[in-house]
């Protein structure tokens, strides 16, 4: 379960940011996670609660924005959102598309304080 190591990294980054800002507690952490990031959101939430114990993030809410897979289709000359991220084919022209524009993100976007 690599979500636990991801959760520990999130807690470390957020705790460091809180200390640098002189903040005692973080109430929410906002993440953007792409559909291709290989992260199970529920497992990350569970792991985050464990990793946050005894830190300024204890009890903080983990808010996850899921990012769909967007690819560039050279035949349509457009960015398109894949309806099935397992099939890298343009939903407009049904041609193969391999240039990923979005969908691999794993970003800490914002921290909220009480």
Swiss-Prot record:
DNA-binding recorded as keyword: no
Binding site for Zn(2+): 73, 76, 90, 93
Any one biological process term the GO annotation gives: protein maturation
InterPro entries noted in UniProt: Hydgase_Ni_incorp_HypA/HybF_CS (IPR020538), HypA/HybF (IPR000688)
Gene3D superfamilies from the UniProt entry: 3.30.2320.80
Gene Ontology molecular function: nickel cation binding; zinc ion binding
Coiled-coil blocks: none
Pfam families to which the protein is assigned, alphabetical: HypA
Keywords: Metal-binding, Nickel, Zinc
Binding site for Ni(2+): 2
Function: Involved in the maturation of [NiFe] hydrogenases. Required for nickel insertion into the metal center of the hydrogenase.
Similarity comment: Belongs to the HypA/HybF family.
Protein name: Hydrogenase maturation factor HypA
Source organism of the structure: Chloroflexus aurantiacus (strain ATCC 29366 / DSM 635 / J-10-fl)
Origin organism lineage: Bacteria, Bacillati, Chloroflexota, Chloroflexia, Chloroflexales
Gene transcribed to yield this protein: hypA
């Amino acid at each position: 379960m690599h979500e636990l190591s991801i959760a520990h990294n999130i807690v470390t980054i957020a705790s460091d940011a809180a200390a640098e800002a002189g903040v005692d507690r973080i109430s929410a952490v906002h993440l953007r996670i792409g559909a291709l990031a290989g992260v199970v959101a529920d497992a990350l939430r569970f792991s985050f609660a464990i990793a946050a114990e005894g830190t300024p993030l204890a009890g903080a809410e983990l808010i996850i924005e899921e990012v769909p897979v967007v690819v560039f289709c050279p035949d349509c000359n457009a960015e398109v959102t894949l309806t099935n991220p397992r099939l890298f084919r343009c939903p407009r022209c049904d041609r193969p598309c391999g240039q990923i524009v979005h969908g691999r993100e794993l970003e800490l976007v914002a921290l909220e304080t009480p």
